[in-house]
């Protein structure tokens, strides 16, 4: 019979931010491909828990997404 493992004792793996892993310091609002990674299916900004970003990078990401939406590069709502 197979041995059943208990996953409750394991610590969850810490998510690594895509930006810090690539060494990106500045988040540009014109880089739509990068910003779309931080938006979920309903075009909402993903939380830090989902993205694994630090507080500072999450603020920069959110501001860049808001600027891109204002300029018209990203949609506000799902089509």
From Swiss-Prot:
One of its GO terms (biological process) is translation. GO terms for molecular function: small ribosomal subunit rRNA binding; structural constituent of ribosome. InterPro entries: Ribosomal_bS18, Ribosomal_bS18_sf. GO terms for cellular component: cytosolic small ribosomal subunit. Keywords: Ribonucleoprotein, Ribosomal protein, RNA-binding, rRNA-binding. Binds as a heterodimer with protein bS6 to the central domain of the 16S rRNA, where it helps stabilize the platform of the 30S subunit. Belongs to the bacterial ribosomal protein bS18 family. PANTHER family: 30S RIBOSOMAL PROTEIN S18 (PTHR13479), SMALL RIBOSOMAL SUBUNIT PROTEIN BS18M (PTHR13479:SF40). Part of the 30S ribosomal subunit. Forms a tight heterodimer with protein bS6. This is Small ribosomal subunit protein bS18. The gene is rpsR.
């Amino acid at each position: 019979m197979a041995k059943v493992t208990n996953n409750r004792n394991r610590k969850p793996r810490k998510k690594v931010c895509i930006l810090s892993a690539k060494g990106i310091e500045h988040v540009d609002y014109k880089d739509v491909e990068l910003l779309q990674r931080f938006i979920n299916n309903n075009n909402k900004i993903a939380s830090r828990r989902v993205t694994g970003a630090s507080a500072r990078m999450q603020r920069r990401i959110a501001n860049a997404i808001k600027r891109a939406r204002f300029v018209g590069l990203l949609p506000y709502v799902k089509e």
